[in-house]
């Protein structure tokens, strides 16, 4: 999931450099959402591993 977040962040960067504001904003939003979900799942995984 971190890989997809990085991919969308790179797409947003390239789109913003080329002047595609809408695509850049949408890609940035997807990257942020995926990054937050990945961090939450990682924290849940670390907590659940510690209890077993």
Curated annotation (Swiss-Prot):
UniProt membrane topology term: Multi-pass membrane protein
KW Transmembrane (keyword) present: yes
Q: Keywords of this protein's UniProt record, alphabetized?
A: Cell membrane, Membrane, Transmembrane, Transmembrane helix
Q: Does the keyword Coiled coil apply?
A: no
UniProt similarity note: Belongs to the UPF0391 family.
> What protein name applies here?
UPF0391 membrane protein A1S_3910
- Organism, as annotated: Acinetobacter baumannii (strain ATCC 17978 / DSM 105126 / CIP 53.77 / LMG 1025 / NCDC KC755 / 5377)
- Its predominant location is membrane
Q: Any idea where this protein resides? A: Cell membrane
**Transmembrane portions of the chain:** 6-26, 30-50
Q: Name one GO cellular component term.
A: plasma membrane
